[in-house]
Every structure is written in structure tokens, then in C-alpha cells.
């Protein structure tokens, strides 16, 4: 993780050097001395876009210097709940209006809330030591004034962000898996899956190609709930989810579910390569699973067959 940006960072510096030598007009530049600087600048600029791209008309009216002041002042993570009512005064109860009498105070609060959210997220991800807050401030300012794209091209920014998030996902996933291995009584398999029995089932084990009905709660490596079948459908109806173990679930489930017994409750810790892989940023995941029922392939997931004449 430490050197995940090195090849790109070297290319970025070389490109900037060549372009500055070939241009007659001195371009707007920012000096980066490390990968940490580059990443921090990008993080700041991307956070500015959460303001500049969310409410285009209102954004143009904001006092940008006050937004920057609020953001910089609140990067220590000071809660700013009082600012919520101020923003309602600025934008109205439905956030469709704009009251210029609250311009200065509201702009300051916009920055404070953005700064707090940024600090909170970075701290939760365990990445405070990977960020140079001085460069975050610079990136935020440039992003707010829309000059960040002259420093780093948008595609390059997206690449840097993707690599950063993926690296954090891998690190946090590994921490989750290592912690899970130390839980008394868990089963640890060679492929990295950790299976914890919370309540032993008394029914049969599903076969490798069976259908099953389950309830489940999916959480991230940091413990955030992503999905839950217990929440029910759009009508509030809570029913077990029918799934096919033969291609209808992630590889981690195809491996772990047959090791469960109907009626049991389990927790599966799944490495990223047996979850959704690279397409979901190499996230390792945790599933609480209540195995309700099993049936032969096609019992729960195939369409109802009509009688042939």
C-alpha cells in the first residue's frame, strides 16, 4: 500500500515538467514533493466538487472565501450540528431557495460541515497518517475555484482516488479477517474464509448446487451495514431471500453455505477475491446468515413451470 502511487506519481511529475517547458505562458501549478502531497491535494479537490457539482446555481452565489475558511477551520473534526439550521435559513426548508441575508454565515457553515465530514471519513478509514492537511486545504481551494483540473487532469484524479480507496479496502479487509481468525471456535479455511457458528442448525447441509432461502445482513470491513433482508421489501414485507448456490451467489457463499445446517445462524468473513473482486474495489465483506431452508436446484429460484399438453 505504501508505494501504490509511485509509478503514476513519477509519470505525473515528468508530464508536468515537459508541459511547463513547452508552454510560453506560465501555467498555474502546485508543487508536489511526495505521493502523500498529490493524494491529499486530490482528496481536497474532490471534496470541493461535492459542493460545486451538487447545486450549480446556488454554488455560484456562495461566498467561496467563507466556504474555504469554514472547511479549513473544521478539519480537526469539530461537530457542527448548529450549521444545519443555518443552511436551512440559507436554502429554505426544502433547499430550493436562496436567502442572501444568510450568505456569509451559510457559506461558512457549508465549509464547516464539509470539513467535518472529510475528517470523520478519513479517520474512520484509518487514513489520517496518509494525509497532508495543508495540501488538502490547497486542493479544496483550487477545486472550489475550478482550477484543480489545470494541476491534475480529471482522469488522473479519478485514478488516484480509485487506487487510494482500493488500497484502504484491502488494508481494512485484512484487519477484519485477522481479527475474525482470533474469535474462539471459528473455522478458518485455506482460501481465507472465516466461518463463525452463532447458533448451530439441526437441519441438513445444502448441496453445492442447491437452492436456499436465507436472511442475511451484509456489513463492510469497518462494520457499516450495507444490506439487510430483515428490512423487508418496499411494502415492508419481510421474507427470506431465495438464492441458487449454483452461480447465483458470490464464490464465498458457494463455498461457505454448504458447510451450514438449516436452522442455524452464522457469520461469514469473506476475502475480497471471493466476494465481488476488483469490480467493487477489492472489498472484503462480512455476512450474517440465517439459513432458513434448502431445496434441490430449481426449487426456489426457477420460474414456475407450466404443464405441457
Which residue stretches match the model-derived regions?
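Cross-family detector of peptidyl-prolyl cis-trans isomerase
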Residues: 21-309
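Bacterial Sec-dependent N-terminal signal peptides
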Residues: 1-31
Amino acid at each position: 500500500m505504501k508505494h501504490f502511487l509511485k509509478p503514476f506519481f513519477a509519470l505525473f511529475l515528468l508530464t508536468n515538467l515537459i508541459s511547463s517547458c513547452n508552454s510560453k505562458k506560465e501555467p498555474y501549478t502546485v508543487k508536489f514533493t511526495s505521493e502523500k502531497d498529490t493524494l491529499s491535494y486530490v482528496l481536497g479537490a474532490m471534496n470541493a466538487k461535492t459542493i460545486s457539482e451538487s447545486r450549480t446555481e446556488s454554488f455560484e452565489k456562495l461566498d467561496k472565501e467563507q466556504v474555504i475558511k469554514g472547511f479549513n477551520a473544521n478539519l480537526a473534526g469539530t461537530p457542527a450540528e448548529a450549521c444545519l439550521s443555518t443552511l436551512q435559513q440559507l436554502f429554505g426548508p426544502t433547499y430550493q431557495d436562496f436567502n442572501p441575508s444568510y450568505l456569509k454565515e451559510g457559506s461558512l457553515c457549508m465549509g464547516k460541515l464539509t470539513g467535518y465530514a472529510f475528517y470523520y471519513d478519513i479517520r474512520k478509514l484509518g487514513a489520517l497518517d496518509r494525509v497532508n492537511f495543508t495540501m488538502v486545504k490547497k486542493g479544496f481551494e483550487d477545486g472550489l475555484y475550478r482550477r484543480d483540473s489545470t494541476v491534475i487532469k480529471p482522469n488522473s484524479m479519478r485514478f488516484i482516488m480509485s487506487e487510494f480507496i482500493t488500497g484502504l479496502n484491502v488494508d481494512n479487509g485484512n484487519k477484519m479477517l485477522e481479527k475474525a481468525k482470533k474469535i474462539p471456535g471459528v473455522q478458518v479455511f485455506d482460501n481465507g474464509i472465516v466461518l463463525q457458528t452463532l447458533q448451530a442448525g439441526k437441519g441438513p447441509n445444502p448441496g453445492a448446487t442447491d437452492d436456499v432461502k436465507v436472511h442475511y445482513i451484509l456489513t463492510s470491513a469497518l462494520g457499516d451495514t450495507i444490506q439487510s433482508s430483515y428490512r423487508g421489501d418496499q411494502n415492508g414485507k419481510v421474507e427470506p431471500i431465495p438464492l441458487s448456490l449454483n452461480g447465483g451467489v458470490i464464490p464465498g457463499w458457494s463455498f461457505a453455505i454448504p458447510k451450514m445446517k438449516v436452522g442455524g445462524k452464522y457469520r461469514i468473513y469473506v476475502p475480497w477475491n471471493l466476494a465481488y473482486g476488483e469490480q467493487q474495489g477489492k472489498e472484503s465483506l462480512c455476512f450474517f446468515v440465517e439459513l432458513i431452508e434448502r431445496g434441490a436446484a430449481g426449487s426456489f429460484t426457477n420460474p414456475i413451470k407450466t404443464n405441457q399438453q
